[in-house]
Amino acid sequence: MVSWCASVQAGIVLNTTRVIYQGNDKEVSLGVHNSGGGEILLQSWLEAPALATGNDPATQRLPFIVTPSLTRMAGGGKQLLRIIHSGTDMPTDRESVLWLNVQEIPQTAAQNTLQIAIRQRIKVFFRPDGMPGDPLQAPEQLNWKTGNNDSLQVENPGPYHVSMLKISVRQDDVELASIESQMLAPQQSLHIPLLRKKGGAPLVVSFVSINDYGGQVPYRATLANHESGYASKVMPR
C-alpha cells in the first residue's frame, strides 16, 4: 500500500519543498532525514507530469538520474540525494518542471502486519542557461483579462512557471471565483468561470505566489470592465 503525503509524517523529511536546477549546474542536491526510529529503504525517482506529456509518467525516459535511487537509512539517519542532468533533450527557451518522488519502504515486519509506503513528491524546476528575465518577477508578468460577464482569463507570456495559491476574484466584496491552487506553465493561459458580475464595478483579483524559496508572496490586480491588467505585490502595512 502507498500513502501520498505533501508534508511531513513520522518518517522521511525533505529539507526543501522544491528544487531549482540551473542549466549550468552539474548537479543539485537535497537532504532526506529518517525521523523514525527504525531502518527503512529509501527509493527516489523523477517523472514528467502527465499533463505536459500526454503519456504515462512511468514510461518516460528523462535525461536525469537520481542517485542513490535505492538505499538503506538507519533510524534518525540522513541521506543526500543528487540529481544529475545528462545535458540533452530538454527545452532551451523555457523552464521545465518534473516531479521528484521520494518513497519510504518499511522493513519487513511480522506476518499479517500491514506495511505502508510513504511517498512524498516535490517539483523540480529545470532552467536552461541564459534564459531572460527574473523568475521572482514572473507573477507580475501575468496578464489578467476580463471577458464577458462570466469569464476571466489569465495568460503567462514568460518562460517561467508561476505557482499560485488562494486565487480569488471579487467585485464589490462579493466573491465571483475561488481557486485553491494553480500552476501556470510558460505560454499557458487559464480560463476562470465567474459568477455573473453586475454593472461596471472593477474586479479585484488576489492570489499568493510561491517563490523559489518556498515563500508565499501576496499579489493583487484591479481590472476595469473589459480591460486587462497586471498584478502587483501587496506590501505589508
Give the ranges of each region predicted by the language model.
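Beta-sheet-dominated interaction scaffolds and their linkers
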Residues: 10-35, 133-147
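Soluble periplasmic/extracytoplasmic beta-strand elements of cell-envelope proteins
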Residues: 31, 41-45, 80-82, 99-101, ...
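Asparagine-centered strand-capping/turn motif at beta-strand->loop junctions
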Residues: 30-36, 152-158
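Extracytoplasmic
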Residues: 25-27, 39, 78, 95-97, ...
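Short, hydrophobic/aromatic beta-strand segments
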Residues: 38-46, 161-167, 219
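Terminal connector regions
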Residues: 86-131, 199-237
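Intrinsically disordered, low-complexity Pro/Gly/Ser/Thr-rich segments with frequent PxxP/GP/PP motifs
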Residues: 54-89, 173-200
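Sec/Tat signal peptide C-region and signal peptidase I cleavage site
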Residues: 4-10
